[in-house]
């Protein structure tokens, strides 16, 4: 399955919530007056959804929010199911640990897609916990571990899009599980977020029910 490259706002409208696929310069409800309307000719026509369709819709929503493809998502679920504790919470934590997501959460990318591009273009470095040196990486799916330090490479620090993203991030706020110094363009992943710190609009139990069939 190829990565979606069409209009991002249409995806958010389809899911009925802001998937944070746009920069956030304008609020979601301001960018479109159709915020509560599903795209298409019959967007206002809503049939009663089946249990399966609700579960599938929730999976699609989370995949699109984090920019993850089907096979990747299924692998994340399998690994989460093997871990102790709540499978759904482990799944969300794995998605939050993705390097592209961490770069976005730290405020170096205005969207996850932009953060993914920064990583792919080798503009991001990582220093593993206990190590002394940073290493340039280009794999967005790297799982960031507690104590890892993420930094923008020296050659990329003057990029206007990074500076704009930082400005947006100061308005949005930085999650408590991260420690970021925007003046140095680096930050530390302190620990995995608790469920209460993660997006409230996600109902991960529906995803667990879907994969449990």
From Swiss-Prot:
InterPro entries: Ribosomal_uS4, Ribosomal_uS4_bac-type, Ribosomal_uS4_CS, Ribosomal_uS4_N, S4_RNA-bd, S4_RNA-bd_sf
Superkingdom of this protein's organism: Bacteria
One function term, GO molecular function aspect: structural constituent of ribosome
Family annotation (Pfam families): Ribosomal_S4 (PF00163), S4 (PF01479)
BP-aspect Gene Ontology terms: ribosomal small subunit biogenesis; translation
Residue ranges occupied by any S4 RNA-binding domain in the UniProt entry: 97-165
CDD domains xrefs: S4
GO terms under cellular component: small ribosomal subunit
Transmembrane segments: none
Key words of the record: Ribonucleoprotein, Ribosomal protein, RNA-binding, rRNA-binding
UniProt xrefs under SMART domains: Ribosomal_S4, S4
Subunit structure: Part of the 30S ribosomal subunit. Contacts protein S5. The interaction surface between S4 and S5 is involved in control of translational fidelity.
Physiological role: One of the primary rRNA binding proteins, it binds directly to 16S rRNA where it nucleates assembly of the body of the 30S subunit.
PANTHER family, sorted: 30S 40S RIBOSOMAL PROTEIN, SMALL RIBOSOMAL SUBUNIT PROTEIN US4M
NCBIfam families in UniProt: PRK05327.1 (NF003717), rpsD_bact (TIGR01017)
Classification via HAMAP family: Ribosomal_uS4_B (MF_01306_B)
Family under the similarity heading: Belongs to the universal ribosomal protein uS4 family.
Entry protein name: Small ribosomal subunit protein uS4
């Amino acid at each position: 399955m190829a990565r979606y490259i069409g209009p991002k706002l249409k995806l958010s409208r389809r899911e009925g919530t802001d998937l944070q696929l746009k920069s956030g310069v304008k609020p979601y409800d301001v960018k479109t007056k159709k915020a509560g309307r599903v795209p298409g000719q019959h967007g206002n026509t809503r049939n009663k959804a089946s249990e399966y369709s609700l579960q599938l819709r929730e999976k699609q929503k989370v995949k699109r929010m984090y920019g993850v493809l089907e096979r990747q998502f299924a692998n994340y679920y399998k690994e989460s199911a093997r871990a102790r504790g709540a499978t759904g919470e482990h799944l969300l934590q794995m998605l939050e640990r993705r390097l592209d997501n961490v770069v976005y959460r730290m405020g170096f990318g205005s969207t996850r897609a932009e953060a993914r591009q920064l990583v792919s273009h080798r503009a991001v470095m990582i220093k593993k916990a206990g190590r002394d040196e940073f290493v340039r990486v280009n794999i967005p799916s790297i799982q960031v571990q507690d104590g890892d330090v993420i930094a923008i490479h020296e050659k990329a620090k003057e990029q206007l899009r990074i500076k704009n993203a930082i400005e947006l991030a100061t308005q949005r706020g930085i999650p408590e599980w991260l420690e970021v110094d925007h003046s140095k363009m680096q930050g530390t992943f302190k620990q995995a977020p608790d469920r209460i710190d993660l997006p409230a609009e996600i109902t991960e139990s529906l995803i667990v029910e879907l994969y449990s069939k």
